[in-house]
């Protein structure tokens, strides 16, 4: 099997405001479980942003409960997450996208760390 590099993704979803708080918490837990089990991802961070006003109405609502989840996966099973969002009526909007900027920062930090280690061990230096 070929090695597939893990990528960093951000998934934002909005839960309808008429859903009770306990049920909203359960929905967030279900999304996390889908990311871990079906998408085979590793969750990095979960941000519950709470109720926010919309710039325009969405499905006759003027506000919603926002949640953002950052996770790593190879991207092959992301459709499982999108399908869950699509068939869950309490989730009124969602968007999942790859975070190239975070991947770039991570690669840069790894290169800098490797360069610092090379200097410490005396590798890759110029000869006098």
From Swiss-Prot:
InterPro entries: Ribosomal_bS6 (IPR000529), Ribosomal_bS6_sf (IPR035980), Ribosomal_S6_plastid/chlpt (IPR020814), Transl_elong_EF1B/ribsomal_bS6 (IPR014717). Keywords: Ribonucleoprotein, Ribosomal protein, RNA-binding, rRNA-binding. Signal peptide: none annotated. One of its GO terms (cellular component) is ribosome. One of its GO terms (biological process) is translation. Pfam families: Ribosomal_S6. GO terms for molecular function: small ribosomal subunit rRNA binding; structural constituent of ribosome. Belongs to the bacterial ribosomal protein bS6 family. Binds together with bS18 to 16S ribosomal RNA. This is Small ribosomal subunit protein bS6. The lineage of its organism: Bacteria, Thermotogati, Thermotogota, Thermotogae, Thermotogales. The gene is rpsF.
């Amino acid at each position: 099997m070929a090695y597939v590099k893990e990528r960093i993704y951000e998934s934002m979803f909005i839960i309808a405001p008429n859903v009770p708080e306990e049920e909203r918490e359960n929905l967030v837990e279900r999304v996390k479980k889908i990311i871990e089990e079906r998408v085979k991802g590793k969750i990095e961070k979960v941000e519950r942003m709470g109720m926010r006003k919309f710039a325009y109405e969405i499905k006759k609502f003027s506000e919603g409960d926002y949640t953002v989840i950052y996770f790593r996966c190879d991207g092959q099973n992301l459709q499982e997450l999108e399908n869950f969002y699509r068939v869950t009526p309490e989730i009124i909007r969602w968007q999942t996208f790859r975070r190239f900027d975070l991947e770039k920062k991570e690669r840069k930090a790894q290169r800098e760390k490797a360069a610092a280690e090379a200097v410490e061990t005396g590798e890759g230096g110029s000869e006098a």
